[in-house]
């Protein structure tokens, strides 16, 4: 990125002090995103410099004195150092330079603004060095945010202990490298403090007792430091308004030499608004007693994991009726899982793993309607898996491994159709693998682990329906029979472990043809015959283990076998070949060359039969296309001419509305023609889509088709048509003007000078698009396949609601998968329709002569999701990587996604939300990647339908609402206070 090389703020000051009369001063600014274009253009064209400054982007002046009182140039990708000359803005109340790339140190001169400055935000930059103690002079400061920089050294005492301590409400120094203690002594009274965010530093010492004076505190986050001492019970007891308390990953202990948690829980009894409590990773000792019932009924999340808490889980925890997350994992808890947990009807995630819990899993857990994750792994639980788990329709991850569970795998688990992970490994389960489970869990997309049990019988053929699953582990059981060749249908499979069973017969070659398989272990079975060549020819296989079978034949050291050692073939005495340590093969006699023509003739005949017949059939099939009657389209157009819903607009009215289709009104162009913005006589703002006369013959069918679809469909997420205008040589669609342009402009703001969206907005937009396309596929009066879904065809209204547009190449669908063309539309088997759509978004089957289907739109939507997360256009990936966006993302999934998720988070990170929400944001981004990969699978039949996709996007949208906003102290409130 080309960062600014000039101090932007310094330039502002030189202009204000009328030192900017030199014509070339504006040329010193390197402004890569053109974020400050108004500064440059106005300073070079206007004679009244002072007035111009007040009109500049990010600048606000006092209306009476025209003195600059606010400077907010946050989130504009600016760089350079912050100039000390900022102190010359003596009337400044708000200074916000956050979310840029400023480097260097914080100028101590900012402290001279003590008479006026109320809000200072320098967060999310690259600033380093110490925090200047001069900032302690800012005695009117209300809001201080220096978080997410590279600051080091100790926190200056003056920052907390001076005149400003009476006014400071918000302090964020988080995510730096600050050391030393929290500098609060008995003389410091931060009485107005509501937010204290010091997480992810290197702070030591105890929580200062004088913090108890901050009785208005709502949010205290000291997580991920090196703080020590007893949990600050006396401090917390004086904070009745506390809503969020994060003390995880420090070195705190409980009372009475780390044996008693009771005083701390008692101190929280006054905090009736408490919503989240996190104490994880402190090695806290003690028990969770019945006093937990006195905690706030508003509690939503409790994190007590990674401690040394012992005793049982008190049934009284069921009094916390609003709890959605309970994490007690990695402790020393014993006793049974309380049945009373079923009273927590809002529970979504329960983590009880890695404890010493005993008894049976309560069947009542199956009555928690929203439960999406249950992890009770690594305990001493016994008994059977409850049948009631089949009631958990929202269950996505079920982890029961590492217990002493017995009985069979319940068939009812097949009802948990949203399961992504099922891990029942390392138990004492018996019986066969239920057909009802594997046949219904088609959506299982992460892993299935049934290893280390006593399961018997064959692998059900229905397992092959799991075409989304990434990993299957059935090892260390008593399974028998053949390995089904149908497992080759699990096309997403990357890891397959069938070792230590009783499988016999030959190894199916279809496993070697799995396109993403990386690891295969079939050791310790009774497999016979040769290793199929497909395994050696695989380009993805990295780890193979064929040991201790009865395999025979020649093994080459070529292809995927080139990096294998003899350890992959131990105990297979009948194998020979060129692997180091393996016995060499005996030479075979060569057949006379006279047999070669005979063999070729025997092979050629069936090949011609196999490949020739489909070609003949395909040519016949192309002649039997069903088409829409041309008369139907024309009759409909005549009928709509008198429809009051579509007012008639003359050609002259459109000329007047668009200024004669002036170039200044042009807002877009494409193959079909041009789009102009305009204003009708009733002040309606419109977009006029005009068909180019030069291409009228070629695209007239597209024009009619778009008219037809827009008039027949109505949905809040589809563009509506105002009317049409046609005359000889002129065809136009009149549509509402979308003030926020296309999604493409927001995904690539550097190209279009648009503001970035955030993750919440993007998920809402994708949810809107999915709803719109689902309507077209399943509920529209005429079923429609869009065929060209991409960011530029998604428009955003003034409320950032997404509307799908551009139906010029859509197909009308008559049956479930039967495409019916309009008068000029043909199958994708024709030259005209072969690659109908946009490169990078076109489903691969369209390039092989397949007809338009709803699966193609699902593919395009998946590409859209992957594009949003990766920040890369699919065409860029094709050019630079030589692969599709799906293949690019698949190569990073799941182990190498951290960098991609980090970059996505840096681009789309929501503002005005606590850093604590980052865990949730990462999960949402990961799920967007997973959904994108599922939607872009090569085989169309394995993709979900758009109703399922819309449901998933709706769930992610609701999931994001779980993260609270900064409750009281919004930036608007701060600015309002600053300007008062």
UniProtKB/Swiss-Prot annotation:
Main location: membrane
Repeat (LRR) residue spans along the chain: 65-89, 90-113, 115-138, 139-162, 165-189, 191-214, 215-238, 240-263, 271-295, 296-320, 322-344, 345-370, 372-391, 392-416, 417-440, 442-463, 464-490, 491-514, 515-537, 539-563
Keyword tags: ATP-binding, Cell membrane, Glycoprotein, Kinase, Leucine-rich repeat, Membrane, Nucleotide-binding, Phosphoprotein, Receptor, Repeat, Serine/threonine-protein kinase, Signal, Transferase, Transmembrane, Transmembrane helix
Active site: 788 (proton acceptor)
Keyword DNA damage: no
Catalytic activity annotation: L-seryl-[protein] + ATP = O-phospho-L-seryl-[protein] + ADP + H(+); L-threonyl-[protein] + ATP = O-phospho-L-threonyl-[protein] + ADP + H(+)
Record-listed ATP binding positions: 667-675, 689
EC numbers for this chain: 2.7.11.1
Database matches in InterPro entries: Kinase-like_dom_sf, Leu-rich_rpt, Leu-rich_rpt_typical-subtyp, LRR_dom_sf, Plant_RL_S/T_kinase, Prot_kinase_dom, Protein_kinase_ATP_BS, Ser/Thr_kinase_AS
Side Extracellular, residues: 21-593
Membrane topology qualifier: Single-pass type I membrane protein
Glycosylation sites: 55, 88, 152, 162, 175, 213, 257, 270, 322, 327, 380, 391, 428, 449, 497, 545, 554
Family as reported in the entry's similarity comment: Belongs to the protein kinase superfamily. Ser/Thr protein kinase family.
Name of the protein: Putative leucine-rich repeat receptor-like serine/threonine-protein kinase At2g24130
Organism of this sequence: Arabidopsis thaliana
């Amino acid at each position: 990125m080309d960062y600014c090389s000039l101090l932007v703020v310094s330039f502002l000051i030189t202009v204000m002090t009328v030192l900017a009369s030199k014509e070339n001063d504006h040329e010193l600014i390197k402004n890569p995103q053109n974020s400050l274009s108004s500064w440059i253009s106005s300073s070079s064209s206007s004679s009244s410099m002072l007035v111009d400054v007040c009109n500049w982007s990010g600048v606000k002046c006092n209306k009476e004195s025209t003195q600059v009182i606010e400077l907010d140039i946050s989130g504009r990708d600016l760089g350079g150092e912050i100039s000390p000359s900022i102190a010359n803005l003596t009337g400044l109340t708000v200074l916000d330079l956050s979310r840029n790339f400023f480097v260097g140190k914080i100028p101590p001169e900012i402290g001279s603004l003590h008479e006026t400055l109320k809000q200072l935000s320098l967060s999310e930059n690259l600033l380093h060095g110490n925090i200047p103690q001069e900032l302690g002079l800012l005695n009117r400061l209300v809001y201080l945010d220096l978080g997410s920089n590279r600051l080091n050294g100790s926190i200056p005492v003056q920052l907390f202990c001076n005149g400003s301590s009476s006014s400071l409400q918000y302090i964020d120094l988080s995510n730096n490298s600050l050391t030393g203690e929290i500098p609060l002594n008995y003389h410091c009274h931060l009485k107005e403090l509501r937010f204290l965010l010091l997480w992810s530093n290197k702070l030591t010492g105890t929580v200062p007792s004088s913090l108890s004076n901050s009785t208005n505190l709502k949010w205290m986050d000291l997580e991920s430091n090196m703080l020590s001492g007893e949990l600050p019970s006396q401090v917390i007891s004086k904070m009745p308004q506390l809503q969020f308390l994060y003390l995880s990953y420090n070195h705190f202990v409980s009372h009475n030499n780390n044996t008693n948690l009771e005083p701390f829980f008692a101190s929280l009894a006054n905090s009736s608004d408490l919503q989240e409590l996190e104490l994880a990773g402190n090695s806290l000792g003690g028990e969770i007693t019945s006093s937990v019932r006195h905690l706030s009924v508003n509690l939503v999340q409790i994190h007590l994991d990674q401690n040394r808490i012992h005793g049982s889980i008190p049934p009284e925890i069921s009094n916390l009726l609003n709890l959605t997350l309970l994490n007690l994992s990695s402790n020393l808890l014993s006793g049974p899982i309380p049945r009373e947990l079923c009273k927590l009807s809002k529970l979504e995630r329960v983590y009880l793993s890695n404890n010493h819990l005993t008894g049976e899993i309560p069947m009542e857990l199956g009555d928690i309607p929203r439960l999406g994750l249950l992890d009770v792994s690594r305990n001493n639980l016994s008994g059977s898996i409850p049948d009631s788990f089949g009631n958990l329709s929202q269950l996505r991850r079920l982890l029961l491994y590492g217990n002493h569970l017995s009985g069979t795998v319940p068939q009812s688990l097949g009802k948990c159709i949203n399961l992504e992970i099922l891990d029942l490994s390392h138990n004492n389960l018996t019986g066969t693998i239920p057909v009802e489970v594997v046949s219904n869990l088609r959506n299982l997309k992460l892993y299935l682990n049934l290893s280390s049990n006593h399961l018997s019988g064959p692998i059900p053929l229905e397992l092959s329906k799991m075409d989304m699953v990434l990993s299957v582990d059935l090892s260390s059981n008593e399974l028998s029979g053949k390995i089904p060749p149908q497992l080759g249908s699990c096309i997403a499979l990357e890891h397959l472990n069938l070792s230590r069973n009783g499988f016999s017969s030959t190894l199916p070659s279809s496993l070697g043809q799995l396109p993403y398989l990386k690891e295969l272990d079939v050791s310790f079975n009774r497999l016979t015959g040769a290793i199929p060549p497909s395994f050696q020819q695989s380009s993805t296989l990295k780890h193979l283990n064929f040991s201790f079978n009865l395999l025979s034949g020649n093994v080459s050291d070529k292809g995927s076998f080139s990096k294998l050692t003899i350890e992959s073939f131990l105990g297979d005495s009948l194998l020979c070949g060129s692997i180091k340590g393996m016995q060499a093969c005996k030479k075979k006699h060569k057949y006379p060359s006279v047999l070669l023509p005979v063999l070729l003739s025997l092979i050629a005949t069936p090949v011609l039969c196999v490949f020739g017949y489909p070609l003949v059939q395909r040519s016949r099939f192309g002649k039997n296309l069903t088409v829409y009657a041309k008369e139907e389209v024309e009759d409909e157009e005549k009928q709509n001419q008198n429809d009051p819903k579509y007012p008639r607009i003359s050609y002259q009215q459109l000329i007047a509305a668009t200024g004669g289709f002036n170039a200044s009104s042009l807002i877009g162009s494409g193959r079909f023609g041009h789009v102009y913005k305009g204003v009708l006589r009733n002040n309606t703002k419109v977009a006029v889509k005009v068909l180019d006369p030069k291409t009228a013959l070629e695209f007239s069918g597209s024009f009619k088709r778009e008219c037809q679809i827009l008039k027949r469909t109505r949905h809040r997420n589809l563009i509506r048509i105002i009317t049409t205008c046609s005359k000889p040589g002129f065809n136009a669609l009149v549509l509402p003007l979308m003030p926020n342009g296309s999604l493409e402009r927001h995904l690539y703001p550097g190209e279009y000078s648009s503001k970035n969206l955030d993750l919440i907005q993007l998920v809402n937009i994708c949810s809107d698009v999915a709803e719109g396309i689902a309507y077209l596929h399943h509920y529209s009066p005429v079923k429609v396949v869009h065929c060209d879904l991409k960011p530029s065809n998604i428009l955003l209204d003034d409320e950032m609601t997404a509307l799908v547009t551009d139906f010029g190449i859509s197909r009308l669908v008559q049956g479930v998968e039967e495409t019916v063309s309009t008068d000029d539309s043909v199958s994708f088997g024709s030259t005209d329709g072969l690659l109908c759509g946009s490169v990078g978004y076109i489903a691969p089957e369209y390039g092989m002569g397949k007809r338009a289907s709803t699966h193609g739109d699902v593919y395009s939507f998946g590409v859209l999701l992957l594009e949003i997360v990766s920040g890369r256009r699919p065409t860029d990936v094709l050019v630079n990587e030589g692969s599709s966006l799906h293949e690019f993302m698949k190569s990073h999934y799941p182990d190498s996604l951290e960098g991609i998720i980090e970059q996505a988070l840096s681009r789309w990170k929501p503002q005005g939300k606590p850093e604590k929400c980052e865990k949730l944001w990462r999960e949402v981004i990961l799920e967007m990647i997973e959904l994108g990969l599922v939607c872009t699978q090569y085989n169309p039949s394995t993709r979900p339908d758009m109703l399922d996709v819309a449901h998933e996007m709706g769930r992610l949208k609701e999931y994001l609402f779980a993260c609270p906003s900064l409750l009281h102290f919004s930036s608007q409130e701060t600015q309002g206070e600053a300007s008062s």
